[in-house]
């Protein structure tokens, strides 16, 4: 059975990217209870075998989504004929240097689409899976979670290096890639092209509205109850939503709150969710680079944080949503257009993990820096912080 409404992708979780709303209100009861999922209670410790399988799923599993990317969007044809490595790197695709033969980059033509086909054949393009026949034609092309939620360390050259799973690919221009499809109408292509690098709208193919989100990190999730900006469900809920409705995977997903009920036989998604979650839970938030934080200033900032921010950014997870709290957009001072499209109609306080790494901030990327975030909440929450206190608070946030 095919999914007729899927036209895009993204990945998993959609967790947050910065300081989220501070306030004390909760949404009505009917919007606070996440839909039940197949997700079992989290284990205290996942086995090495399960985490290893989860890594495989995260990096290489398409869930059968070739039915979208190949059969419907025909992007296999576009990549084979028109996408050379230089173009691929410009739209944010990454290359895993660990699978490249020594010296290969010095020997190949980075302006030839045939080189892209060769890289796909070596399984070197992060987040893409391709079947290449004996005549070097791409017969099947699909995407994986890693497309949006992995990057590389640029150790070979920009866009080519060692994998960094869980790091959001803020260079990836998802919309521009989708817009390469020869089957899309011009007005649809214009919407996709408007999103820009590092953003994606995981509901556009459901409601026809466009309010793209910043691609979130997939690390630091182990103590976080709900993984989306609007807290509609736990990690396996969102993984299933994206795998089925966005990536085009052949699996089951149902949420009556959103009017979605998709089933496939066989279901290629549900059985893989526990291992995928185990791998995501194993990915720690990256510490700030050595020497990048002034410890004395950060300690002053911690005192300010404890006084002004910790009522919402509570505990090790940094979110009061673990206790069920959501915040109406009016309390946050951020745009409510995206929340209005969701089941909860509200925003979750975002966990503060690895903030130094993933600017811009807020769900829509409207704050370019942590200083902008602090200034925003100083104004909205009337905190009365001096410029020096704001700088101290920023330094503390960089340390998380």
What spans do the regions from the language model cover?
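C-terminal motif of bacterial Sec signal peptides marking the signal peptidase cleavage site
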Residues: 19-21
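Bacterial N-terminal signal peptides that target proteins for export
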Residues: 1-10
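N-terminal acidic, proline/glycine-rich, low-complexity intrinsically disordered segments
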Residues: 2-3, 24-26
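Hydrophobic helical h-region of N-terminal Sec-dependent signal peptides
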Residues: 9-17
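Electron-transfer interface patches adjacent to heme c in soluble/periplasmic c-type cytochromes
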Residues: 25-27, 34-55, 60-277, 281-298, ...
